[in-house]
Structure formats: C-alpha cells, structure tokens
C-alpha cells in the first residue's frame, strides 16, 4: 500500500497595508520577515532592501520568524518603503497609473495643432526629400506615414516621424531600401501594426528607434536586421526580448529601459559589439551568464531592478566596462566590492573620471561608486 504524501505545511494570511491598499499575502506559518519581503516584491515593486515591515508598532526583524513576533493569521502589517528602492517604474500603489500612450499622443497632437497649423505634406516637395536623403516629419500631427514618403524609394537615408500619432508602419517601408535611420519614437504603434517583413527587407538599416510606443513583444524577425547598430525600445510594455536578438552581431547600443522585462535570453551574449546597454526600470532578477561575453561593453545601467547578484567573473570578462549603475537594486556597494575583478574595474573608471575628481568644487561632489550603500539598518 502506497503511503500518502505528507500534508502541506500550514500557512497563514497576513494583511499588508501599502500605498492605500490592503494586500493579502499567504505565507508559511514558519516564514521569516525576510520571506514575507520577498513575496511582497512582485506585489509592490519595492525591493526587500527598501521594505520596513511594522506590526503592532514594532519593526519586524528580517531573520526572526513571524510567529516569534506575534504575527499570526489575519495580522495587519504596515509596509513602509524607502524612496528609490524599487524595481520597474516605481512602487505599485492604489493610485498608480500610467497614462495610455494614445491619450498622451492625443494631448501632444492637440498642443502641436495649437502652436502651428497641420503639416500639409502634399505641399512638401518630395524632390527636396530625395535631394537631401532626409525626411523630417516629427511633431507634424500625423496619424499615418504620408504616401508620398514611400515614393521616394532608395533616395532616403533618414526617416524621422517621431512625436506623432502614427499607429502603423505598412509593408511599403520596404521601398526605402537605402534607409539607414528610422525614428518612430513617441507614436501609437502596437504589436501587429508594424510590418517586420517590410523592415527586414531594409538591410541598410543601422538605427531603429521604437521607444515610447505600445509594444508588448518583439518578433523573431528582429534578428534578420543584421546591420543594426542601435536599437532603442525604451518606455514600452515589453516583457522579454526575442532569442534572435543574439544574431545582431553589429549591435552597439541597446536602450530598453522602462519596460516590464523579467528575464534576458542567454543569446544576448551573441551581441558581441555591444558597448552601451540600458535596462533600468525593468523587473530583472538576474543577468544571464552570457553577459560576460560582451567584452566591448563600456556602460551598463540596470538601475531599479530586482538584481541580487552579477554574473560570475563579470568584471573580469567585461574588461572595458567603466560605467555601471546598480542603484535601486539589491546589490549594494558592500556586495559590489566583494565581486572578483572589482578592483580593476574601479581603477578603470576612476582613471576615466580623474579630471572630474581633480577639479571638483566643494566637498559635496562625491564619486559615484555605482550602487547604493546598505540602507537596511537605517
């Protein structure tokens, strides 16, 4: 006769008050305050290091069990958050809201219409665009890319339609087969409304900016734009990056801050030319070990993420790194100084900034070590 599985450990539900709302959290009865903080991180976006839990007027000590501090089923706990110690865009509160991109665009367009009359593209001579190779239509109250643009064909090197209300990029983008820079920042482009098939036909493209749109995913076909050197996808709602991003061997700059990215594919190690990466204000808990393959990396910002450690031998492998921003993560200066290769990294960045240090004015100018001090005991 088979023995029955052991019963699950007993649990309690704690009512946590934070940001104008009450959050019920189920935890094992034997849990510690540190365990409760880890459970609260995805529910509040506040890093455990930035949480102070108070029950019945007493601060809960991390290492102590909840039961030893008289926290029982139904207990009410108040969460106080340290400023700046959060992942993503900020702590999740009752009144947290991000204005819909379409609302923001509509407001921008309305202001533009007040300041100037609508751009009458039909009166703009496409011949001038062809002569200069540049189409500059930013802040032009556009809801779509004008048809006249596609007729310019291979004459165009730069297309800038940023800060409009454009909702789609059609297949006709393929007609701009000599395009090098495509600036689509601050529009209303959502998943499925951009012809990636058309974009992959533009093999001359080196700069693509899709920041401040409504993207949730990027397709695998992104990896087919093989000459891309700069990719800007900040301020969207991206939850991940496609595995195929590792095919972008020439990519030098990746700006993907203020999204909802929870993990990175290990294939990112294939982006061997990367020298600047901004992944700040996302939901990352770790960086893949393959980050160590980025031997040309000079600047990395992962501010306001849930990171607790760096890849092994990160400082040793990324031997050109001189700028690192880990503020608002679980990695403090004390932790950072224990990482192998930190001394060499510190020497490189201090050498770069030596002139600033030599000519600093007053005692308030302090060299930024790249991470926070440990606030846990404040």
Swiss-Prot record:
<feature type="repeat" description="LRR 8">
    <location>
        <begin position="294"/>
        <end position="317"/>
    </location>
</feature>
<protein>
    <recommendedName>
        <fullName>Plant intracellular Ras-group-related LRR protein 8</fullName>
    </recommendedName>
</protein>
<feature type="repeat" description="LRR 9">
    <location>
        <begin position="319"/>
        <end position="344"/>
    </location>
</feature>
<feature type="repeat" description="LRR 2">
    <location>
        <begin position="153"/>
        <end position="176"/>
    </location>
</feature>
<feature type="repeat" description="LRR 5">
    <location>
        <begin position="226"/>
        <end position="250"/>
    </location>
</feature>
<feature type="domain" description="Ubiquitin-like">
    <location>
        <begin position="10"/>
        <end position="86"/>
    </location>
</feature>
<dbReference type="InterPro" id="IPR001611">
    <property type="entry name" value="Leu-rich_rpt"/>
</dbReference>
<feature type="region of interest" description="Disordered">
    <location>
        <begin position="85"/>
        <end position="120"/>
    </location>
</feature>
<feature type="repeat" description="LRR 1">
    <location>
        <begin position="129"/>
        <end position="152"/>
    </location>
</feature>
<feature type="repeat" description="LRR 7">
    <location>
        <begin position="272"/>
        <end position="293"/>
    </location>
</feature>
<feature type="repeat" description="LRR 4">
    <location>
        <begin position="202"/>
        <end position="225"/>
    </location>
</feature>
<dbReference type="InterPro" id="IPR032675">
    <property type="entry name" value="LRR_dom_sf"/>
</dbReference>
<dbReference type="Pfam" id="PF00240">
    <property type="entry name" value="ubiquitin"/>
</dbReference>
<feature type="compositionally biased region" description="Polar residues">
    <location>
        <begin position="93"/>
        <end position="106"/>
    </location>
</feature>
<comment type="similarity">
    <text>Belongs to the SHOC2 family.</text>
</comment>
<dbReference type="InterPro" id="IPR003591">
    <property type="entry name" value="Leu-rich_rpt_typical-subtyp"/>
</dbReference>
<dbReference type="InterPro" id="IPR050216">
    <property type="entry name" value="LRR_domain-containing"/>
</dbReference>
<keyword id="KW-0677">Repeat</keyword>
<feature type="repeat" description="LRR 6">
    <location>
        <begin position="252"/>
        <end position="271"/>
    </location>
</feature>
<comment type="function">
    <text>Leucine-rich repeat protein that likely mediates protein interactions, possibly in the context of signal transduction.</text>
</comment>
<dbReference type="Pfam" id="PF13855">
    <property type="entry name" value="LRR_8"/>
</dbReference>
<keyword id="KW-0433">Leucine-rich repeat</keyword>
<feature type="repeat" description="LRR 3">
    <location>
        <begin position="178"/>
        <end position="201"/>
    </location>
</feature>
<dbReference type="Pfam" id="PF23598">
    <property type="entry name" value="LRR_14"/>
</dbReference>
<dbReference type="InterPro" id="IPR029071">
    <property type="entry name" value="Ubiquitin-like_domsf"/>
</dbReference>
<dbReference type="GO" id="GO:0035556">
    <property type="term" value="P:intracellular signal transduction"/>
</dbReference>
<dbReference type="InterPro" id="IPR000626">
    <property type="entry name" value="Ubiquitin-like_dom"/>
</dbReference>
<dbReference type="InterPro" id="IPR055414">
    <property type="entry name" value="LRR_R13L4/SHOC2-like"/>
</dbReference>
């Amino acid at each position: 006769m088979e023995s029955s599985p052991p019963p699950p450990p007993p649990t309690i539900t704690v009512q946590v008050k934070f940001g104008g709302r009450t959050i019920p959290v189920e935890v094992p009865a034997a849990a510690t305050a540190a365990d409760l903080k880890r459970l609260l991180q995805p529910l509040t976006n506040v890093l455990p290091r930035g949480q102070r839990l108070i029950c019945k007027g007493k601060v809960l000590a991390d290492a102590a069990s909840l039961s030893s501090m008289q926290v029982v089923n139904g207990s009410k706990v108040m969460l106080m958050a340290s400023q700046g110690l959060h992942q993503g865009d900020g702590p999740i509160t009752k009144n947290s809201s991000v204005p819909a991109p379409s609302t923001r665009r509509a407001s921008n367009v309305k202001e533009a219409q007040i300041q100037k009359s609508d751009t009458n593209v039909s009166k703009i001579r496409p011949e001038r665009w062809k002569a200069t190779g540049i189409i500059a239509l930013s802040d032009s109250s556009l809801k779509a890319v004008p048809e006249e643009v596609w007729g310019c064909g291979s004459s165009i090197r730069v297309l800038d339609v940023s800060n409009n209300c454009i909702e789609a990029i059609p297949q006709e983008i393929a007609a701009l087969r000599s395009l090098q820079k495509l600036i689509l920042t601050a529009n209303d482009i959502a998943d499925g409304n951009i012809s990636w098939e058309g974009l992959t036909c533009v093999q001359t493209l080196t700069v693509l900016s899709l920041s401040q749109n409504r993207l949730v995913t990027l397709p695998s076909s992104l990896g087919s734009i093989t000459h891309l050197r700069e990719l800007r996808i900040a301020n969207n709602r991206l939850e991940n990056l496609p595995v195929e991003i590792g095919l972008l061997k020439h990519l030098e700059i990746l700006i993907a801050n203020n999204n909802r990215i929870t993990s990175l594919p290990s294939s990112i190690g294939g982006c061997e030319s990367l020298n600047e990466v901004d992944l700040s204000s996302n939901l990352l808990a770790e960086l893949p070990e393959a980050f160590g393959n980025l031997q040309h990396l000079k600047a990395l910002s992962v501010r306001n993420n849930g990171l607790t450690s760096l890849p092994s031998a990160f400082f040793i492998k990324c031997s050109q790194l001189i700028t690192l921003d880990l503020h608002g993560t679980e990695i403090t200066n004390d932790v950072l100084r224990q990482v192998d290769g930190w001394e060499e990294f510190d020497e490189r960045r201090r050498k770069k900034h030596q002139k600033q240090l030599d000519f600093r004015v007053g005692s308030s100018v302090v060299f930024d070590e790249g991470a926070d001090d440990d606030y846990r005991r404040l």
